[in-house]
A protein has these predicted regions:
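Aromatic-rich carbohydrate-recognition surfaces in CAZymes
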Residues: 100-107, 111-183
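Acidic/polar, glycine-enriched structural segments that form the non-catalytic walls/loops
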Residues: 1-100, 181-183
């Protein structure tokens, strides 16, 4: 309650440009998360800032003679990185805010731009390894051998025909980009 002013259905924080923290859970969980952030928030923020800077300076090697285009490319790099998450292993969300789940085919289509052209080969390899763990391995299943179409915390769907071939294509692309044929 401290530092907030209520305006109708809106809330204005009194903490200026530093933003605000929102937690969800029991009161005890929320207090624990806030205390954790208070003790390490500045360090976390500095680490995040360093990560974003390295994404832009080390991984985004595309530069033009148009500053506005360069800025847009930087934003695309950072925005795409925000979609790389940990849910059921490492993966790429299909899109936020509505598609905060892994769609196999979409993930494999976006992987070159999200990971490979930026040189984040270890992340791409981990995504493939983690998604391979979700393969249907039940010989009695009608979707036996398939890579999921969709994976979220509620379950896994195998209702696609192109997810598995796209998985194989991306494994080949990771090998081609990284030179690592033994991963």
């Amino acid at each position: 309650k401290k530092g907030f002013t209520r305006y109708g259905d809106g809330i204005k924080t009194g903490i200026g440009s530093e933003g605000f923290i929102m937690t969800y859970g029991t009161e005890e969980e929320c207090i624990r998360l806030l205390e954790e952030f208070r003790s390490s928030g500045k360090k976390m923020k500095a680490e995040r800032k360093d990560r974003i800077n390295s994404l832009i300076t080390e991984y985004n090697s595309i530069r033009t003679n148009l500053p506005e285009l360069d800025k847009a490319l930087d934003w695309i790099t950072v925005t795409m990185d925000e979609l790389i998450t940990e849910q059921q292993g490492k993966g790429i969300y299909a899109g936020l805010p509505w598609f905060n789940e892994y769609w196999g085919r979409d993930m494999f289509i976006s992987m070159p731009g999200a990971c490979l052209v930026t040189g984040q080969f270890d992340i791409a390899k981990q995504i493939l390894k983690d998604f391979a763990k979700l393969q249907d391995t039940d010989p009695a299943s009608e979707t036996y051998g398939r890579i999921p179409n969709r994976a979220n915390l509620e379950g896994i769907l195998y209702n696609t025909t192109d997810g598995t071939p796209r998985f194989v294509i991306q494994a080949l692309e990771v090998a081609r980009y990284s030179g690592d044929t033994g991963f």
